[in-house]
């Protein structure tokens, strides 16, 4: 059977055939834009060099809180808004394992960060982006900047692992104590486990509010 294509249908067929290519091109440009935004934010807010020596994340990780707010590359949130464990999502590769880090390089203040870094969350061996199925080394703790210390940066980093991680030296830290949280370095943990550069990242900023004393009581401070 011979199918005749009229001249009037040719433009429609042409654009239909180009639609997948156009969509792929748009998606690639969007991803490049996000990578540029992440790099600019990590430089602007001096996450490089305060947390990372170089190599900012190439993609943005989604961090959404049940209070209705989300991290957006340095926006200002409140400790009250981020007190509960957020939903963290990224475009994971099938079968891959990931490490999640949340860290504050401004403890107790950005001017005098004598406890840099104070890490708030550490999960390894995450299959895909199913954090609940990963191994939690440090349970989630919300933001607790001391009064009159200004804005603190809370940095999220996602690393792709080359294999499973075991770290008996770090142990398991609960969210009822601040012990062993301060003086920790994301860069040291990354080097120890050969994680390379972060694939995904994000950050927000926060300063003291009325939730902080509640958190301090939870931590026994």
Curated annotation (Swiss-Prot):
UniProt xrefs under Gene3D superfamilies: PEBP-like
Protein name listed in UniProt: Phosphatidylethanolamine-binding protein homolog F40A3.3
Similarity comment: family membership: Belongs to the phosphatidylethanolamine-binding protein family.
UniProt GO MF annotations: lipid binding
Source organism, top-level taxon: Eukaryota
Pfam families xrefs: PBP
Keywords: Lipid-binding
Entry's Gene Ontology cellular component terms: mitochondrion
InterPro entries linked: PEBP, PEBP-like_sf, PEBP_euk, Phosphatidylethanolamine-bd_CS
